[in-house]
Swiss-Prot record:
One GO BP annotation of this record: tRNA methylation
Gene name as annotated: rlmN
Protein name: Probable dual-specificity RNA methyltransferase RlmN
Organism: Geobacillus kaustophilus (strain HTA426)
Pfam family, one: Radical_SAM
Compartment(s) where it occurs, according to its Swiss-Prot or TrEMBL record: Cytoplasm
Gene3D superfamilies: 1.10.150.530, Aldolase class I
One annotated Gene Ontology cellular component of this protein: cytoplasm
Length: 365
């Protein structure tokens, strides 16, 4: 494992809020702003190309724009840059970034390397309020939502790191710190920006959004008409067990969640992925596999079994590999499409929120 730790960090709240991030503007919003300034709408495409194809961080570098417009942009917007506080590189090529925001809060972003390309896992909130009992992200609670531009900036920052080796980000998973549907408007704007051909041009079917199950937003997301991949953090096959693992299940119980999933499938015609973390002696027995098969029977779906990373602050243990394979076989016996997630960054702080939690501990010593 390689670790890089740059200069000292700011204290939370130490700096003044910056100008609005231009990364938060969709192409249409940027066109509207330009027209209001007396500029031609085509300038928006030029600006997008500078931001997302050339990845400049200074409006002065946008040399095909009139000087007056560059000055207007600089006085109206910022180009969000994230300060790298910690960079951990795993033996398998996974890179975990701890980025510092303008107000001193920190977020995690992960670059995962696959045979088919490079995937970036982005964060949508500083902390999380959902309170899943197995997750490091909820330690310390929710501090604030990220703006769309702060989510976009994570992908841009990772892409800039890949530019040195002529690689590109080929897919995005919205599975980092926070509940994406708890920051819904910023999420949707982020998805439209990174998916736009003039933006980062990541294909919709190469983007996955995961939710713990905020039911009203599932219906709303289904109605958006986006071809984004959709995943549910399920982790339990019964209402009682899911409530123990995920307190959100009290507000949005499993039967109602499954109704929303059925609506999503019927509305979009797309498959849903159920993420199922395996916790030793808790939800990993063959009876749980049978219950899970019954729960999702007949649905257009896929199950992703997740060997969980150990989190010191939590009491859960990893399921033995032999038991994971037995669980997989039990599901396949029922005709369930199932895979075991490949583990990334096992030798670094790979669990979501783990690196940030460690840094928070060090700050308070």
């Amino acid at each position: 494992m390689e670790m890089v730790r740059p200069a000292a960090r700011r204290s939370v709240g130490e700096t003044q809020p910056p100008l609005p991030s231009i990364y938060s503007l969709t192409l249409d919003e940027l066109k509207e702003w330009l027209v209001a300034q007396g500029e031609k709408p085509f300038r928006a495409t030029q600006i997008y190309e500078w931001l997302y194809q050339n990845r400049v961080t200074d409006f002065a570098d946008m040399t095909n724009l009139p000087k007056r417009l560059r000055e207007q942009l600089a006085s109206s917007f910022s180009i969000t840059t994230l300060k790298t506080v910690v960079k951990q590189t795993s033996k398998d090529g996974t890179i975990k970034f701890l980025f510092e925001l303008h107000d001193g809060y920190s977020i995690e972003t992960v670059l995962m390397r696959h045979n088919y390309g490079n995937s970036v896992c982005v964060t949508t909130q500083v902390g999380c309020r959902i309170g899943c009992t197995f997750c490091a992200s909820t330690l310390g609670g929710l501090k604030r939502h990220l703006e769309a531009g702060e989510i976009v900036a994570q992908v841009v920052q990772v892409q800039k790191a890949l530019d040195d080796t002529n690689e590109r980000v080929s897919s995005i998973v919205v599975m980092g710190i926070g509940e994406p549907f708890d920051n819904y408007d910023a999420l949707i704007k982020f998805l439209r920006i990174v998916n736009h051909p003039k933006g980062l041009n990541i294909g919709a079917r190469h983007i996955t959004v995961s939710t713990s199950g905020i039911i009203p937003k599932i219906y709303q997301f289904a109605d958006e008409g986006m071809q984004i991949n959709f995943a549910i953090s399920l982790h339990a096959p019964t209402n009682e067990l899911r409530t123990k693992l995920m307190p959100i299940n009290k507000a949005y119980p499993l039967p109602k969640l499954m109704e929303a999933v059925r609506y999503y499938i019927e509305k979009t015609g797309r498959r849903v992925t159920f993420e199922y973390g395996l916790f030793g002696g808790v939800n990993d027995q063959l009876e749980h596999a049978e219950q899970l098969a019954e729960l999702i029977k007949g649905l257009k779906c896929h199950v992703n079994l997740i060997p969980v990373n150990y989190v010191p602050e939590r009491n859960y243990v990893r399921t033995p590999r032999s038991q994971i394979f037995a669980f997989e076989r039990a599901l396949k016996k029922h005709g369930i499409n199932v895979t075991i997630r490949r583990e990334h960054g096992h030798d670094i702080d790979a669990a979501c929120g783990q690196l940030r939690a460690k840094e928070r501990k060090e700050e308070t010593r």
